[in-house]
Amino acid sequence: MKMKIFIITIVIALFITSIVEAQNKLDVKCVRLETCREPCKKQLCLLPMKCMNGKCVCSPSRKIC
């Protein structure tokens, strides 16, 4: 029984790690906040950035410090 719980814990930990790694691959940075003519590459976001009103913005507006 203890071995089964241990294996389930390992599987859950690996699953969470894979989700975090996938999220890190989605991170986009912004080069210029004032224009979206170039790809967004300066700010780190939890999700890819979008060009809104000529500016690169995080969507949702949560940044990774």
Swiss-Prot record:
Q: Which InterPro entries match?
A: Scorpion_toxin-like_sf, Scorpion_toxinS_K_inh
Q: What is the annotated tissue distribution of the protein whose record heads this document? A: Expressed by the venom gland.
Q: Tell me where in or outside the cell this protein is found.
A: Secreted
Q: Which residues form the signal peptide?
A: 1-22
Q: Which GO terms of the molecular function aspect are on file?
A: ion channel inhibitor activity; potassium channel regulator activity; toxin activity
* Major location (coarse): secreted
Q: Which cysteines are joined by disulfide bonds?
A: 30-51, 36-56, 40-58
The free-text domain note is: Has the structural arrangement of an alpha-helix connected to antiparallel beta-sheets by disulfide bonds (CS-alpha/beta).
Q: Which family does it belong to?
A: Belongs to the short scorpion toxin superfamily. Potassium channel inhibitor family. Alpha-KTx 12 subfamily.
Q: What does this protein do?
A: Inhibits voltage-gated potassium channels.
Task: Supply the name of the protein.
Answer: Potassium channel toxin alpha-KTx 12.6
Per the UniProt entry, what species is this protein from, by scientific name? Answer: Lychas mucronatus
